[in-house]
Structures are given as C-alpha cells and as structure tokens.
Amino acid sequence: EEAMPSAWPCCDECGTCTRMIPPRCTCMDVSPSGCHPACKNCVQTTLGGRDVFWCMLRIENFCKRRCTPAR
C-alpha cells in the first residue's frame, strides 16, 4: 500500500537510524507518484518491475509518526 502523507515527515517502514538523540533515520516507504515536496533527495528506482520513488534523506524522528494507520 503506497500512501502519500499529508503531514511530513512520517514513515510506515523505518530504515536505519543513528544512535544520536534524537535519532536521525531513513524511511523505506516508496510511492509510484513521487516524493513529498519537502524531500530534497527523491530517487527514482525500480521495484518489482515498476518505477517507484524513494526519499533518501536521514531526518530526525523520521520514524516517530506513521503515515497510515497501523493495522
């Protein structure tokens, strides 16, 4: 499920985080329609044979808030 968050930063699938306080994390979320406008490093890649976009920033508390409700 790809979701374009309205409030940013948010992340459903957290990547790696630093040990700093607060932690600076990457997010593994991808979207077929592009990154959030605030993302300054949006990369287009292929996943499962389709083009997707991934924000490759390391942001403080990136994984603190989900973009979509937890299941």
From Swiss-Prot:
Keyword Flavoprotein: no
SUPFAM superfamilies according to UniProt: Bowman-Birk inhibitor, BBI
Disulfide bond entries: 10-67, 11-27, 14-63, 17-25, 35-42, 39-55
Glycosyltransferase keyword on record: no
Site (Reactive bond for trypsin): residue numbering on this chain: 19-20
Transmembrane portions of the chain: none
Family: Belongs to the Bowman-Birk serine protease inhibitor family.
Function: Inhibits trypsin but not chymotrypsin.
Name of the featured protein: Bowman-Birk type trypsin inhibitor
